[in-house]
Amino acid sequence: MYAIVETAGRQYRVEEGKILYTERQKDYSPGDEIVFDRVVFVRKDGEVLVGKPYVEGAKVVGKVLEHAKARKVKTVKYRPRKNSKVEKGHRQWYTAIKIEKIEL
């Protein structure tokens, strides 16, 4: 069984027991329970439920594991014949969530 949930303006495919990495959820601390009620799609034992726009009564329950930063993404701006370049780096915050159950 799997579902597609919408959070932080993006859609993610989730399964029970798997870990979901999303944009940082500032309102939750590690160990808190998080509930996604914007379920767009559910597939269970060959049965398919598609929401218009969301599936009625469906929710996904997970537990926040950690807030951390992803690997550094480096960008380089090089100017030919000027002997100059600019290097920048960015590390995006993310939240790791363990999916505990999908309820209909």
Curated annotation (Swiss-Prot):
Keywords: Ribonucleoprotein, Ribosomal protein, RNA-binding, rRNA-binding. The keyword Cytoplasm does not apply. Pfam families: Ribosomal_L21p. InterPro entries: bL21-like, bL21-like_sf, Ribosomal_bL21, Ribosomal_bL21_CS. The keyword Ribosomal protein applies. GO terms for molecular function: rRNA binding; structural constituent of ribosome. GO terms for biological process: translation. GO terms for cellular component: cytoplasm; ribonucleoprotein complex; ribosome. Part of the 50S ribosomal subunit. Contacts protein L20. This protein binds to 23S rRNA in the presence of protein L20. Belongs to the bacterial ribosomal protein bL21 family. NCBIfam families: L21. This is Large ribosomal subunit protein bL21. It comes from Thermotoga sp. (strain RQ2).
